């Protein structure tokens, strides 16, 4: 009976190992399926990290944290294997209960192994984004470099040099053109005209005082009548009228006024105004008597 019992114990060990392997196989397959899915999922963050260069630093930090967590998780399954072997050696007596416990113990390390496999798979999948992020970062400064290079010439424009002031030219003394009649002293005018009324006044045909009054009333100075002031003065010496003036007026103007006076008194037909000198006039009769003598001689 003893040998048969030994053979039964060996069969129980092999029988217990087979269900454990069968259970471990689907667990490993499930672990592989789970590992492959994270790889596919990890590829998406890799593409997102390549597009968003700014998030590369955060992805690198996550990778480091995952690697640090994977190391203690891998150490735990390694310690769990010897513990499971010692339990199998100590539990040889109960044949029916041992296979169930061994199957559970074998199934427990299988998920534990799958967990590090997932983490290990996530670390290499996440690592490429970090590598891709590095060239992306390098490309970003390279792209940004031309902008400062282009801006550099604008900043480095040379300041305009102050133009040297030209030496002041020697100032020329310019003589102002003085217009004629401005700023010059006017020469004093002194006019003296005489009108000789001796021949007419002796015959009591004409009054010299009345003639003087008429000339004063009609004579214009600066275009105005009764504007003589101290500029024009009148004198009578015997039967002559003397007109003195500091204002310029023509000799003919005085002759014009004398003729008007003779015409007013109806003396213009017998008396005429004759210039005997440069500045004087004389009143004379027309030669009527000479014509009468000629008529008498003809008879």
UniProtKB/Swiss-Prot annotation:
GO terms for molecular function: RNA binding; structural constituent of ribosome. Keywords: Ribonucleoprotein, Ribosomal protein. Gene3D superfamilies: 3.30.1360.210. Residues 33-42, 55-64 have a biased composition (Basic and acidic residues). InterPro entries: Ribosomal_eL22, Ribosomal_eL22_sf. Pfam families: Ribosomal_L22e (PF01776). One of its GO terms (cellular component) is cytosolic large ribosomal subunit. Residues 65-98, 105-142 have a biased composition (Low complexity). Residues 1-142, 155-178 are annotated as: Disordered. One of its GO terms (biological process) is cytoplasmic translation. Belongs to the eukaryotic ribosomal protein eL22 family. PANTHER family: 60S RIBOSOMAL PROTEIN L22, FI24544P1-RELATED. This is Large ribosomal subunit protein eL22. It comes from Drosophila melanogaster. The gene is RpL22.
């Amino acid at each position: 009976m003893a040998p048969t019992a030994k053979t039964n114990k060996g069969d129980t060990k092999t029988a217990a190992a087979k269900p454990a392997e069968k259970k471990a196989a689907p667990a490993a397959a499930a672990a592989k399926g789970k590992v492959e899915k994270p790889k596919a999922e990890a590829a998406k963050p890799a593409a997102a990290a390549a597009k968003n260069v700014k998030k590369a630093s955060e992805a690198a930090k996550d990778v480091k944290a995952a690697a640090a967590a994977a190391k203690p998780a891998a150490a735990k399954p390694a310690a769990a294997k010897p513990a499971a072997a010692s339990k199998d050696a100590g539990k040889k007596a109960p044949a029916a209960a041992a296979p169930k416990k061994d199957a559970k113990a074998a199934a427990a390390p299988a998920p534990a192994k799958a967990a590090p496999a997932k983490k290990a798979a996530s670390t290499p999948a996440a690592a490429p984004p970090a590598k891709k992020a590095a060239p992306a970062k390098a490309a970003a400064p390279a792209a940004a470099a031309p902008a400062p290079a282009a801006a550099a010439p604008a900043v480095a424009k040379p300041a305009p040099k102050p133009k040297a002031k030209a030496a002041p030219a020697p100032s020329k003394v310019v003589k102002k053109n003085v217009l004629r009649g401005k700023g010059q002293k006017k020469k004093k005018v002194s006019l003296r005209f005489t009108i000789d009324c001796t021949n007419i006044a002796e015959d009591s045909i004409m009054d010299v005082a009345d003639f003087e009054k008429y000339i004063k009333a009609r004579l214009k100075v600066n275009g105005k009548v009764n504007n003589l002031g101290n500029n024009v003065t009148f004198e009578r010496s015997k039967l002559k009228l003397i007109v003195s003036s500091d204002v310029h007026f023509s000799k003919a103007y005085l002759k014009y006024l004398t003729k008007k006076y003779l015409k007013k008194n109806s003396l213009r037909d017998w008396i005429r105004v004759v210039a005997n000198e440069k500045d004087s006039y004389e009143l004379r009769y027309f030669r009527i008597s000479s014509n009468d003598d000629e008529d008498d001689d003809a008879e």
